């Protein structure tokens, strides 16, 4: 059945997805794929398919925040996608994390609203260990500079307590801040 927001259905037969937030990032992803085909564009959800090293891959933008990312992942699940990797940016909370370096997230502080709609707040937001391990190995193979650990998922980009909140989580060893990971991991 065609999904309401991503406008895709199970006839795609794709099991793997890459999820940037920004629809414009799909152009950069498309440059790495073969046999690229634009699929749909509805609201923040732009999609394309292609092949990477012989494997069919779907790229789907999710917009900003856990609510829209949650919609994307639920609808991807409905059409048979079994693994998704979120790519994008985060605000670094630790010195020594440089632009372009990878933050590989093991878990998220659930300071958002979207993740709490799925499970109670006491439930941890943690990565799938198998998929996480694949990401670590791929990063090593590429020679990427990586930082592994926890991120802080929050609800709002701009609010008065943001600076104090960032300092607090930085002292706790949290690597970065975003708005999606907690929802995606629950």
List the model feature ranges, each with a label.
Residues 23, 91, 152-157, 183:
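Glycine-rich beta-alpha junction loops
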Residues 47, 73, 136, 166, ...:
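Short glycine-/small-residue-rich flexible loop motifs, especially phosphate/cofactor-binding loops
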Residues 108-113, 169, 174-177:
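Acidic, His- and aromatic-enriched active-site or binding-groove loops in soluble protein domains
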Residues 125-173:
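Active-site rim beta-loop-alpha module in soluble metabolic enzymes
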Residues 86, 105, 147-154, 178:
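Short, conserved beta-strand edge motifs with alternating hydrophobic and charged residues
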Residues 1-133:
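Metabolite-binding pocket within alpha/beta catalytic cores that recognizes anionic/polar moieties
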Residues 178-186:
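Short glycine-rich, acidic/polar surface loops and turns
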């Amino acid at each position: 059945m065609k999904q309401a927001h991503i406008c895709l259905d199970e006839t795609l037969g794709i099991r793997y997805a890459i999820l940037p937030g920004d629809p414009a990032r799909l152009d950069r992803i498309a440059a790495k794929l073969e046999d690229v085909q634009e699929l749909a564009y509805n609201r923040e959800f732009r999609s394309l398919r292609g092949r990477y090293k012989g494997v069919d891959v779907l790229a789907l933008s999710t917009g900003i925040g856990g609510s829209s990312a949650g919609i994307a992942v639920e609808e991807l699940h409905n059409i048979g996608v079994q693994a998704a990797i979120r790519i994008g940016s985060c605000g670094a909370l630790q010195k020594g994390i440089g632009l372009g370096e990878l933050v590989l997230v093991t878990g998220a502080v659930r300071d958002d609203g979207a993740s709490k709609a799925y499970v109670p707040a006491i439930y941890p937001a943690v990565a799938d260990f198998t998929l996480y391990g694949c990401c670590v190995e791929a990063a090593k193979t590429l020679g990427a500079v990586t930082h592994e650990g926890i991120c802080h998922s929050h609800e709002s980009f701009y609010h008065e307590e943001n600076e104090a909140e960032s300092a607090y989580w930085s002292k706790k060893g949290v690597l970065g801040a975003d708005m999606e990971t907690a929802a995606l991991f629950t």
